[in-house]
A protein has these predicted regions:
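Flexible loop/turn connectors
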Residues: 4-117
Length: 117
């Protein structure tokens, strides 16, 4: 999609492709490289999940790592709540469907510093 829209953007690439997961980011990087687009020199690419192996890509992928243990606990609490089995203290109905999971930005070499306009 990025490559298809270059023509409508005066031949310019966007500054960054922010992908919803690392697998998608890997595909974007591969497609860009196959078309002679350099990552991160021509465009930055980020992923999400920090799956195994992304630190070994070329270039190593900048991504977001979330705490899957916390995410699993939250999912189980929500499932128990929805089944009516939640006697979890401190888990009121007002928290139903809402939760925050800690996340860390893992900066690697697929992103460059944005130039000033």
């Amino acid at each position: 999609h990025i490559l298809d829209n270059i023509g409508s953007n005066g031949g310019r690439l966007p500054t960054c492709a922010v992908c919803s997961n690392d697998v998608m980011a890997i595909g974007v990087i591969r497609a860009l490289l196959e078309h002679g687009v350099r990552v991160p020199d021509d465009i930055s690419v980020t992923g999400f999940d920090d799956i195994p192996g992304v630190s070994n890509l070329y270039p190593p992928l900048t991504t977001v790592r979330q705490d899957f243990d916390d995410l699993g606990v939250m999912a189980m609490k929500e499932a128990l709540f929805l089944m009516g089995d939640s006697d979890e203290p401190g888990y009121p109905a007002s928290h139903h469907g809402v939760g925050l999971v800690s996340a860390d930005l893992i900066i690697r070499q697929s992103v460059r510093t944005a130039s000033r306009c």
